[in-house]
Amino acid sequence: WIMGHMVNAIGQIDEFVNLGANSIETDVSFDSNANPEYTYHGIPCDCGRNCKKWENFNDFLKGLRSATTPGDSKYKEKLVLVVFDLKTGSLYDNQANDAGKKLAKNLLQHYWNNGNNGGRAYIVLSIPDLNHYPLIKGFTDTLKQEGHPELLDKLGYDFSGNDAIGDVANACKKAGVSGHVWQSDGITNCLLRGLTRVREAVANRDSGKGYINKVYYWTVDKRASTRDALDAGVDGIMTNYPDVITDVLNEAAYKSKFRVATYDDNPWETFKK
């Protein structure tokens, strides 16, 4: 999965997919009542990027729905996975469940079209703080209460705080999550980060008894670091330059080992070599 980083304006969806992304990451900010408000990152952000592009959250969802609904004039067949980077740092811990409920209602209405031929992309809820694990239950309970448990098949989970793997496993357990887990690891492109924890996550994924199904690394903009991440065995690479990742995947050393995921590739299944 080539994951376009910080795609917060509707116009950027096309831009990143046209460069080779089959997945995007979108920032979600919340108001003081735990309502998802904007798709917005703000300053500081990655080096070389405009940090200030934004939409109202529900407007972005409608644009995303168009891009992921077959038959729509804006449909992009390649776009199959969306990571919502939930900026819950502005919330109190006791608002996490509420944030999950409100997020679910917004997605249900504006993205999934109340279950009536809505967007088809798989969705990952990415949470930066392990203490905010109740967001997941708020979200999943709401889908069930609203009569759409089938949409849980489209939903995955990530804790993005680079916490110890054992601590993340615990948070998943507390959230009632077993399966559909993407584990992120990374740092802003302005800084360097080694692959120690990525390798640990990959080992957990491949052990057959870990909690992780997929591992992705962020934010990778250079060919050398792309090769290092692929050599470490990641499933996804988040990038500001999808064309760079595409180029590396076309190199002889990687062409036979990796391919770009399509809609038919289940993002919750651990890949067996």
From Swiss-Prot:
InterPro entries per UniProt: PLC-like_Pdiesterase_TIM-brl
Protein EC: 4.6.1.-
Catalytic activity: an N-(acyl)-sphingosylphosphocholine = an N-(acyl)-sphingosyl-1,3-cyclic phosphate + choline; an N-(acyl)-sphingosylphosphoethanolamine = an N-(acyl)-sphingosyl-1,3-cyclic phosphate + ethanolamine; a 1-acyl-sn-glycero-3-phosphocholine = a 1-acyl-sn-glycero-2,3-cyclic phosphate + choline; a 1-acyl-sn-glycero-3-phosphoethanolamine = a 1-acyl-sn-glycero-2,3-cyclic phosphate + ethanolamine
Gene Ontology MF, one: metal ion binding
Pfam family name, one: GDPD_2
Cofactor: how bound: Binds 1 Mg(2+) ion per subunit.
Primary localisation category: secreted
Tissues where this protein is expressed: Expressed by the venom gland.
Protein name (Swiss-Prot/TrEMBL): Dermonecrotic toxin LspaSicTox-alphaIA1ii
Organism: Loxosceles spadicea (Recluse spider)
